[in-house]
């Protein structure tokens, strides 16, 4: 069920254009009739519109003169005049030959004849040199790092090379073919109570179930500018590094407020490394093709469109944190439109949140708008904010923001071609996205790696074969970080995370949220199991059990007291699903079972004013019952007073909410009234139940044949 939030306007504008450069000095120029085959030395990225290319090249030339090669000591213009004077009788324009060695001072040694084959060859070498200079200007720091990042020199140990750069086509085809069959899985214990379940397609070899080893930072083959950010890893990073940098699809279900910054830095480091290595390969291959006379060389190093990394986040402030991490790991001298970005994405925390929990402050602190999208483009030493999607390297967006970019009103598609060549998808704070509208996330994944409807300037001779075959989804890496696992995430893992090189689910072993309650005295916690044939029939079975068993018992207590504040007064009924909430609300309003009961309502759609009134009436006893949804608690974290009984229509997804709800009983526990807690669950609630009662207890509670009621004190 969608949740209504405030919406901000779309921010899809272009980044501001930088001033034009002053151009190359005449000392490094050539005459018109010299071959101008320098296409590889222009903008390094292959999928940018011509107009955008011009803008980017102008922007990248700002303050770039210091990066040019030093000119020869002797003025090339003087040399050119001497050449022209020596060939004054020639009917053809003379050609300048730039000196390659700066320490050659004797201009009399310059040959004046420009018609020989050797001269033409040398002039072509100068053209290649200048083209290379253009590439270096736009992509400084890429080529000199080749030896450090493993490209071309140690590709056998660089996972980028194995996975994307130069994969074994035969092995890749074999894995794609076996992807629809059985996968081999291996379970392994990790650190701090974590364990992993890693899977690979069964291709008939003994390596299919082998887990990756934990590398040291030096083994990651990072770009030199990024390597200093990975001097050492702590326990969590060492645990995740082999999966993330090994290009495994990874579902990590132990994200907390304490490790979120480390996780963010880790996946930003990986995303930057992937983008920079991809650009480096494209530029180097372009230089190779520009020097080859024959068209026999085939270099496939690109996708259909430029965007390579998609990061899905819940709020604008989360986007600010990711950008801060990117710029910290890869500092750039110029950041175009940074002020516009900060003005529209960042905000200060509310001063009224001193009592709010840390997870609430992390999610909703600052600008909590969930309607945004942002393109980031990396050129040389500049980072361009608000670049057009087809000109971007990284796209950061909320699910709603990206969906509205794909669709127009009325369901008419605007286009999803910019998602056709995404090679890495990162979904952070996935548990918060579930509370927004998970349907948007599923829609985005259904639009990934499809065949584009338009060319968008694509050079199909350089498109990787698996894209042409429609197999991009089998090579794409997907990283999902969540505080806990849910059926929605499991479905995403099983259907959309199809990386043929492997995938892993990393889960914690739970002690149980019910053991960490902050209460003055212990409270009896009763769990009631009901039978449910299937997930589709679970809502009906749950409602019937609630009305016939739980509500009937509560109603007897309400009837005994005409004031409604008898034995069952002060009852908070927590309902995770809004659909179930509507059904229970209608039952309270229309059933004879509850016709004399005064009740209040707080859902995610209830206004702040109505919520305050319902809480006040419940605290004062005017309402005997308060119906309260999980999303309402997620977005507002109310401190509800006057609670003496808690009935959980279903277990909360977030185990933190369990503690919040049970601790509402704290004031009653210290008084004369004996508080009660009753929870309904079925076998389809296994993931939720495990987080509450602990990994060691959940199996027996789901399979116990002796009874369906379990009590803990």
From Swiss-Prot:
Alphabetical keyword list: Nucleus, Ribonucleoprotein, Ribosome biogenesis, rRNA processing
Organism domain of life: Eukaryota
Ranges of biased composition (kind: Basic residues): 1-23
Main subcellular location of this protein, as a coarse class: nucleus
Compartments, record wording: Nucleus, Nucleolus
Biased amino acid composition, Acidic residues: 49-69, 125-149
Function as written in the Swiss-Prot or TrEMBL entry: DEAD-box RNA helicase-like protein required for pre-18S rRNA processing, specifically at sites A0, A1, and A2.
UniProt similarity note: Belongs to the UTP25 family.
Protein name per UniProt: U3 small nucleolar RNA-associated protein 25
Annotated organism of origin: Arthroderma gypseum (strain ATCC MYA-4604 / CBS 118893) (Microsporum gypseum)
Source taxonomy: Eukaryota, Fungi, Dikarya, Ascomycota, Pezizomycotina
């Amino acid at each position: 069920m969608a949740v209504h939030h405030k919406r901000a306007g779309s921010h899809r504008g272009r980044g501001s254009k930088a001033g034009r450069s002053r151009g190359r000095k005449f000392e490094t120029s050539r005459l018109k009739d010299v071959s101008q085959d320098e296409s590889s030395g222009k903008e390094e990225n292959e999928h940018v519109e011509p107009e955008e290319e011009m803008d980017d090249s102008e922007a990248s030339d700002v303050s770039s003169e210091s990066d040019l090669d030093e000119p020869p000591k002797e003025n090339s213009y003087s040399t050119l005049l001497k050449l022209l004077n020596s060939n004054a009788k020639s009917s053809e324009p003379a050609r300048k030959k730039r000196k390659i060695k700066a320490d050659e001072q004797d201009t009399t040694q310059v040959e004046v004849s420009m018609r020989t084959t050797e001269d033409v060859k040398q002039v072509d070498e100068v053209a290649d040199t200048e083209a290379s200079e253009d590439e270096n200007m736009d992509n400084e720091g890429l080529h000199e790092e080749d030896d450090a990042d493993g490209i071309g020199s140690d590709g056998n140990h660089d996972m980028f090379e194995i996975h994307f750069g130069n994969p074994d086509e035969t092995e890749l085809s074999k894995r794609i073919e076996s992807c629809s069959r059985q996968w081999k899985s291996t379970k392994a214990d990790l650190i701090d109570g974590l364990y992993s379940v890693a899977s690979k397609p069964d291709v008939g070899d003994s390596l299919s179930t082998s887990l990756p080893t934990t590398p040291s930072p030096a083994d990651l083959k990072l770009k030199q500018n990024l390597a200093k950010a990975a001097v050492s890893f702590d326990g969590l990073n060492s645990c995740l590094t082999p999966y993330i940098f090994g290009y495994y699809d990874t579902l990590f279900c132990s994200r907390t407020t304490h490790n979120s910054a480390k996780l963010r830095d880790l996946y930003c480091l990986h995303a930057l490394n992937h983008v920079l290595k991809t650009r480096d390969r494209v530029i180097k291959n372009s230089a190779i093709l520009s020097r080859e006379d024959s068209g026999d060389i085939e270099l496939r190093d690109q996708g259909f469109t430029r965007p390579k990394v998609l990061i899905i986040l819940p709020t604008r402030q989360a986007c600010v944190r990711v950008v801060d991490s990117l710029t910290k790991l890869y500092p750039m001298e110029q950041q175009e439109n940074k002020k516009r970005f900060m003005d529209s994405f960042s905000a200060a925390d509310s001063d009224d949140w001193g009592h709010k929990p840390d997870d609430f402050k992390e999610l909703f602190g600052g600008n909590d708008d969930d309607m945004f999208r942002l393109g980031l483009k990396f050129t040389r030493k500049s980072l361009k904010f608000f670049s057009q999607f087809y000109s971007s390297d990284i796209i950061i967006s909320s699910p709603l923001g990206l969906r509205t970019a794909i669709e127009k009103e009325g369901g008419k598609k605007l286009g999803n071609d910019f998602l056709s060549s995404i090679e890495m998808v990162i979904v952070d704070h996935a548990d918060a996205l579930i509370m927004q509208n998970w349907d948007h996330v599923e829609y985005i994944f259904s639009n990934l790696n499809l065949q584009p409807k338009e060319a968008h300037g694509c050079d199909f001779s350089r498109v990787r074969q698996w894209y042409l075959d429609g197999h991009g989804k089998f090579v794409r890496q997907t990283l999902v970080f969540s505080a806990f696992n849910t059926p929605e995430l499991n479905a995403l893992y099983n259907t959309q995370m199809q990386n043929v090189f492997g995938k892993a689910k990393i889960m914690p072993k739970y002690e149980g949220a019910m053991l960490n309650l902050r209460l003055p005295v212990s409270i009896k916690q009763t769990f009631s199991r009901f039978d449910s044939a299937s997930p589709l029939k679970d809502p009906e079975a749950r409602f019937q059990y609630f009305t016939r068993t739980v509500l009937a018992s509560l109603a007897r207590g309400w009837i005994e007291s005409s004031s409604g504040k008898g034995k069952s007064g002060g009852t908070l009924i927590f309902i995770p699903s809004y659909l179930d909430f509507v059904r229970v609300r209608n039952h309270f309003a229309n059933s004879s079972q509850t016709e004399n009961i005064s009740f209040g309502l707080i859902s995610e759609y209830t206004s702040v004013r109505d919520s305050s009134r319902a809480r006040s009436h419940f605290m004062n006893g005017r309402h005997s019952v308060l119906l309260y949804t999980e999303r309402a608690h997620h977005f507002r974290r109310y401190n509800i007073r006057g609670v003496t009984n808690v009935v959980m229509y279903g277990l909360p997804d977030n185990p933190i909410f369990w503690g919040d709800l049970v601790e509402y009983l704290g004031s009653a526990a210290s008084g004369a009234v004996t508080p009660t807690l009753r929870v309904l669950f079925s076998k389809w609630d296994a993931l939720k139940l495990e987080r509450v009662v602990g990994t060691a207890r959940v199996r027996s509670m789901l399979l116990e044949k002796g009874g369906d009621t379990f009590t803990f004190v």
